[in-house]
Amino acid sequence: MIRTMLQGKLHRVKVTQADLHYEGSCAIDQDFLDAAGILENEAIDIWNVSNGKRFSTYAIAAERGSKIISVNGAAAHCASVGDIVIIASFVTMSDEEARTWHPNVAYFEGDNEMKRTAKAIPVQVA
């Protein structure tokens, strides 16, 4: 059996640019890509916490240390500057691999300040 698992996640980053006329994609600070293990040109899903929209695109690198999250092209209709989003990538693997898999998660606050990274998502309690 093949399973699709969360590979990397940028949790609650703030959109810094939305450029409708750029070629497409989402430009992401290279430091953020590294923290989540997301590669340039990799497919990503973006979930907009601010407006509930969910969409797919691909990642491109923004300048390291810039804190840029730029939603580009048609996707700019789905996010505005200041929106809080979650960016995720996924990987497929065998059932056996999936049982010991741990995603790369980076947590953000404020103006895209990375607060911590983790190799798991906390258990939700009642």
Swiss-Prot record:
How this protein is processed and modified after translation, per its record? Is synthesized initially as an inactive proenzyme, which is activated by self-cleavage at a specific serine bond to produce a beta-subunit with a hydroxyl group at its C-terminus and an alpha-subunit with a pyruvoyl group at its N-terminus.
Name the UniProt key words of this record, in alphabetical order: Autocatalytic cleavage, Cytoplasm, Decarboxylase, Lyase, Pantothenate biosynthesis, Pyruvate, Schiff base, Zymogen
Q: Tell me yes or no: is Cytoplasm among this UniProt entry's keywords.
A: yes
| Cystine pairings recorded for this chain | none
List the record's Gene Ontology CC terms alphabetically: cytosol
What does UniProt list as catalytic?
S25, Y58
Which GO MF terms are attached to this record?
aspartate 1-decarboxylase activity
Show the SUPFAM superfamilies listed in the entry: ADC-like
Pyruvic acid (Ser) occurs at S25
- Pfam families attached here? Asp_decarbox (PF02261)
Q: What is its EC number?
A: 4.1.1.11
- Name the residues that bind substrate: T57, G73, A74, A75
Q: Which GO terms describe its biological process?
A: alanine biosynthetic process; pantothenate biosynthetic process
Which pathway does the database say it acts in? Answer: Cofactor biosynthesis; (R)-pantothenate biosynthesis; beta-alanine from L-aspartate: step 1/1
Query: Where is the protein situated, by its record's location annotation?
Result: Cytoplasm
Q: Return the cofactor note field.
A: Binds 1 pyruvoyl group covalently per subunit.
Q: What is its main location?
A: cytoplasm
| Catalytic reaction(s) noted | L-aspartate + H(+) = beta-alanine + CO2
Tell me its cofactors.
Answer: pyruvate
- Note whether Nucleotide-binding occurs among the keywords: no
Q: Which family does it belong to?
A: Belongs to the PanD family.
State what this protein does. Answer: Catalyzes the pyruvoyl-dependent decarboxylation of aspartate to produce beta-alanine.
Q: How does it assemble?
A: Heterooctamer of four alpha and four beta subunits.
Q: What is this protein called?
A: Aspartate 1-decarboxylase
Q: Which gene encodes it?
A: panD
